[in-house]
């Protein structure tokens, strides 16, 4: 059922310095004059089949965008399973280094390369035909819609699946997971940059964080193009738990959610 409430507000996806802050973030400002509070019953759902491997994915319409409501499981070369265990790929989807997620030719697979000339506005990457790796702007659009239509509920609460998240630890005693929009974020964690000085094959964040690559590169004033934007969902907070990051190396492996062309 849909109910309407007229609220004037401004949400700012702020820089969190405790608990959910482990990297550089950019604020996502949302200005809404009229809010329509949506429930799960208002969200359209469908299913898409990946013709390459026969995998099927639940999809949801959030605003004007159709999103996969599950992490991609396509077994691209050099994609990973958390802790190198196949179970995690089946339950949480695969983890992809940015270059692999973008499905770029080996000619371009070199550290420091700028890929703007080979990345399409709707870049398919490892997604099935008719779908693509979302841009930074497409993620921002979705997050803005969620924050404009979830009432007083936090963005983390609205997007997280009620399954698999840690039930103990800093801040988690008051954390809720409504999955209001059916997006069903799972705490799949990530694989760290093997060239960043970490000791060994390090997977991190499982049960507490989800990380999703965008197709948008970070091109700073220092011309640092070894990084790309990602979206991190933290399990320790209800509000301001969804953050856009710009400090992760393209060598790190993260989850992929595809968006429809």
Residues covered by each model-derived region:
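Sec-dependent N-terminal signal peptides
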Residues: 6-14
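Conserved positions within compact, well-structured domain cores
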Residues: 23-261
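Positively charged n-region of N-terminal signal peptides that target proteins for export
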Residues: 1-5, 21-22
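C-terminal motif of bacterial Sec signal peptides marking the signal peptidase cleavage site
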Residues: 16-19
